[in-house]
Amino acid sequence: CYTAQEIEGTPIYYSSPEYQLLDNENMPDAWEGCDGNRQAGAVYDMIMPDPQPVKPYGNWNKTRIVVYNQRVIHYMNDVKVLEFQFGTPVWRALVDHSKFSKFSTSPEKCPEAYDLMLQCGKQPGYIGMQDHGYGVCFRNIRIKEL
């Protein structure tokens, strides 16, 4: 069972970090941002995935997100591609230098998200999936409480 609702002026991506799922080859946004921080596996506009084991367009990619004790790990095709921790000076610096910062000069800036991003990991929340109008398929979605 699900429902989808977009409230004007408050997109879902204002509320939390985003594990970027997209086709690196054919989506222009994958090459925007800085140093690959908008490619598949990234924390959108904040942390680039390294390595980048994404499979080409038309193939299934396996993703996994582990969140435990404010530590977050992203996997792509069973390879760890990044790790970070909420509530640290490093996390704050990432937010401060992203389009979510109150101080951002980016034309895509979202300063409304700043305080929400700094509060991430302090309490349980929601898992959301969004699409920007392009085809996307999901299968075998599992959620396990740690």
Tell me what each language-model feature is.
Residues C1-L146:
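Carbohydrate-interacting regions of secretory-pathway proteins
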